[in-house]
């Protein structure tokens, strides 16, 4: 039996573009985790997630920001060329992958447009804000779709997910590289409080021992951040005077 206590990972964005990317990642992971929409409740969860993602995509220049970041990551990799002992074949491989992700994202139609234009998604999306608004008498189209053969529904879901692949692949690679750019280091909070300089970071990643039953309340931006640890049990929980946790600035 392992004597290593489990930990909980928290991530906090330090700017608006990272906030948007993390939300998109969260929604895309949910969409790709739902394959067989065998029941209406499962299907409605899927359609709500699609609607949420479309709302996020409509708020900003998602494609432009991702393309800029893909280019920035390529430039960062170029800097490794002058470092002795670096595996340049791996660096070149990553740069080629970044170029491919960028080209696919650039050539893709307007992000989410095919989902917006899909008749079933559009009908369901219009009714989601109404409590109980997706009943069979409100949405007979959805009711009929749920009675179609499972394979037909699976094919529809796969086609919808496929339209998001240029976004999903670019976003996944960008976030992977950003997360890998920061190493976890042990830190100590005093009386539940910790603050430091962000040094131009985009993302804070924080690991806390689950046994403490604490969660972080983080505020910050690209130059400075502050963390306050709060007990999950607001009445009986205790925050140690000195708390060791792991922190990575990415």
Swiss-Prot record:
Matching entries from Pfam families are given as:
ZapD (PF07072)
Q: Which residues form a coiled coil?
A: none
Grouped into one coarse class, the protein's main location is: cytoplasm
| Gene Ontology BP annotations | division septum assembly; FtsZ-dependent cytokinesis
Q: What task does this protein carry out?
A: Cell division factor that enhances FtsZ-ring assembly. Directly interacts with FtsZ and promotes bundling of FtsZ protofilaments, with a reduction in FtsZ GTPase activity.
Similarity field: Belongs to the ZapD family.
Self-association or partners: how does it assemble? Interacts with FtsZ.
Q: What is this protein called?
A: Cell division protein ZapD
**To which species is this protein native?**
Serratia proteamaculans (strain 568)
């Amino acid at each position: 039996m392992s004597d290593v206590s489990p930990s909980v990972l928290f991530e906090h964005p330090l700017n608006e573009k990272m906030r948007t990317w993390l939300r998109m990642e969260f929604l895309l992971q949910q969409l790709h985790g739902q394959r067989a929409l065998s029941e209406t409740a499962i299907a409605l969860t899927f359609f709500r997630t699609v609607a949420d993602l479309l709302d996020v995509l409509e708020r900003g220049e998602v494609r432009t920001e991702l393309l800029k970041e893909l280019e920035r990551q390529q430039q960062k990799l170029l800097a490794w060329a002058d470092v002795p002992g670096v595996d340049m074949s791996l660096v070149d491989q990553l740069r080629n992958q970044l170029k491919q992700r960028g080209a696919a994202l650039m050539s893709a139609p307007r992000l989410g447009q095919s989902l917006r234009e899909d008749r079933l998604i559009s009908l369901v999306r219009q009714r989601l804000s109404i409590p109980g608004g997706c009943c069979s008498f409100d949405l007979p189209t959805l009711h009929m779709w749920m009675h179609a053969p499972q394979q037909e529904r699976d094919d529809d879901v796969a086609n919808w997910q496929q339209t998001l692949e240029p976004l999903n692949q670019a976003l996944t690679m960008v976030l992977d590289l950003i997360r890998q750019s920061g190493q976890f280091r042990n830190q100590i909070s005093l009386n539940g409080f910790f603050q430091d300089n962000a040094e131009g970071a985009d993302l804070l990643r924080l690991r806390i021992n689950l046994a403490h039953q604490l969660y972080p309340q983080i505020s910050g931006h690209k130059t400075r951040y502050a963390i306050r640890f709060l007990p999950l049990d607001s009445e009986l929980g205790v925050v140690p005077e000195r708390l060791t946790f792991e922190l990575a600035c990415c």
